[in-house]
Amino acid sequence: MRGSEASGPGAIFGAPSTLTTSVIRNPTSFLSSSTPLPSTDADVVAQNVEHVLLSLTSHNDGGLVGVSGNSSGSTGKGILIGVLSAFGSATVAVLVLAIFFFFKYTRRGRIFLDRIGRPGEFDDEQAFAREEAEALEVMDDMSRSEYMRAKSFVEANPPESMQTDISLSQFLAIQEKGVSAWEFQPELEIANCFVEGRTEIEFYDSECSVQTNLPVPKQNDVYYWEAKIYEKPESTHISIGMTTKPYPLFRLPGFHKTSVAYLSTGHRRYNQPFSATPYGPPLAQGDVVGVGYRPRSGTIFFTRNGKKLEDVVHGAKTQNFFPTVGANGPCTVHVNFGQMGFVFIEANVKKWGLAPMTGSLAPPPPYGSEQGSILLESGRESAAQISQRVYQDARTNSTVRIPPSRSPGPVRSPTDISLAPLAHIPSHEDVGEGSSHANTIADEQTPLLNTSDLDQVPPPEYSSPDGSRRGSDITGDLPNQNSPPIPSYDAAVGNQADNTSTPDGDH
């Protein structure tokens, strides 16, 4: 194919270019050489051919323009779709955030008669009043009086009305003692339970509860503690859970606001004094009940003998909960805050105790191991030296001084003024105050006794000889006045010289 033929309009649409070129150059010859058409004029055919060629040419140019227009239109549509999708995503995100913050900050304005999955929580005061009226009609006099007493206490002391956050001194005590900083403190006015060893609680015949001195911390993800029922008669009901302060401790936990408990009957109570909700198996002697608290979500759950039960409380993030145990009869409950291993394995592995087992305060050393301690060793040495010195003084000093007997009555100083008649004291006997002189004379005349004589008691058959000192007076102890005088040093030296010179004179 030649270049002129390739560049013809037939090359664009794939038509034979030679035929098209020949028709364009000499359309009349093409028509004359072809088969004659019936009743067709040559001019009309030529006009039709020209019209076809013009239409083909115009169609080719328009096709090129259409292709470029379609490509530019598709690009614009893609950009528009991307912008609209971005704006749509942003709008959806803003709408979701608006709904979230709306429900978060308007929760107090909503009223739920029954929250999902947690029946028995009253957010409507009218519903609570109706429930209260129905329950008071069927209560006996004792139960009604106890409930009204607790209601008065709650109205006078609303929950969380006192400061219960862990103070700096309590935090330092936890750092020093560890989990030993927690202990149960019974109410002295009730005095119906006895706490032994910080965590061993013994209840008596009437209804009461006991709380810990410190609340559950909120630094970790989960905190957990367990209570084991050591002794429980069939008629005694035990309630194990958590409460806030102040709380009426003459009532069981779970019966009033901001308290939750697992009852030994197998029910649970959450701010519910009238009706209990079935929760788990009943509790018997030897069972272990665990209480877990998640501060970040405000969730409280229970376990029984190492098996986790469903969550009871949700959203209690601002309250300070205190571990609480209550009973209405004689029983014994031992509580484990983390000083021992838990029955719940997950809490054991993840160390969900209230605090570490040991704090920074070292325990006291055992008896008999004072070595290495300067203070204890020095104290032991000083005590040994003092005891040895006293023993030596008792051995060397054989006499003791017996003080004179004093007359009964108050001891008066020499300067005391009394209205009693004074005895006449001659001036030559006492120049100053006579009492001091009399005391010195009495001290000088105090007899001395031998300690060995006091200790050695003679047998009944023994009789002291006549020349012995026993039974003699004080003059026997004095030296003999007729004995020769003791020679001086010079006289003794002179006598020795005379004795040495006498043998020489004999020779």
UniProtKB/Swiss-Prot annotation:
Keywords: Endosome, Glycoprotein, Membrane, Protein transport, Signal-anchor, Transmembrane, Transmembrane helix, Transport, Vacuole. Residues 104-507 are lumenal. Residues 1-82 are cytoplasmic. It is a single-pass type II membrane protein. One of its GO terms (biological process) is protein transport. One of its GO terms (cellular component) is vacuolar membrane. Coiled coil: none annotated. Residues 146-342 form the B30.2/SPRY domain. The keyword Magnesium does not apply. It holds the Pfam family SPRY. Components of the endosome-vacuole trafficking pathway that regulates nutrient transport. May be involved in processes which determine whether plasma membrane proteins are degraded or routed to the plasma membrane. Belongs to the SSH4 family. This is Protein ssh4. It comes from Neosartorya fischeri (strain ATCC 1020 / DSM 3700 / CBS 544.65 / FGSC A1164 / JCM 1740 / NRRL 181 / WB 181) (Aspergillus fischerianus). The lineage of its organism: Eukaryota, Fungi, Dikarya, Ascomycota, Pezizomycotina.
